[in-house]
């Protein structure tokens, strides 16, 4: 699911923080397997919230649940309406594995003798 939020002028930082702290994590309590929040670098008021649900029923339980009703009421006036959301089917995704910080790094090169 993609939710296209648009913060009102001067409210971008406050609003994206509210999504990150309240709205996005609540989705996991309704069966979401993952969420992501993106903010446009070209337009700081444009915020994309992505949520991975297996069923639309779980999505609607989340969207109409008490946490999201509270979120929309608390942040009323800090985002533009209408709020648009669109169900997407994921067809492909891949990630490169990240190197763990606890792995030993390669040894430092030792200068050759006599130089």
Residue ranges and their predicted role:
Residues 21-34, 52-87:
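An amphipathic, aromatic/His-enriched active-site/gating alpha helix that lines ligand/cofactor pockets
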């Amino acid at each position: 699911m993609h939710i296209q939020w648009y913060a009102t002028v001067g409210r971008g930082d406050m609003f994206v923080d509210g999504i990150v702290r309240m709205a996005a994590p609540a989705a996991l309590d309704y069966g979401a397997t993952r969420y992501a929040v993106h903010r446009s670098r070209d337009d700081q008021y444009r915020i994309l919230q992505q949520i991975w649900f297996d069923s639309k029923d779980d999505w609607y339980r989340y969207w109409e649940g008490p946490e999201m009703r509270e979120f929309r009421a608390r942040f009323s006036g800090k985002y533009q309406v209408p709020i648009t959301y669109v169900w997407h089917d994921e067809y492909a995704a891949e990630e490169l594995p990240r190197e763990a910080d606890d792995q030993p790094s390669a040894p430092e090169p030792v200068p050759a003798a006599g130089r």
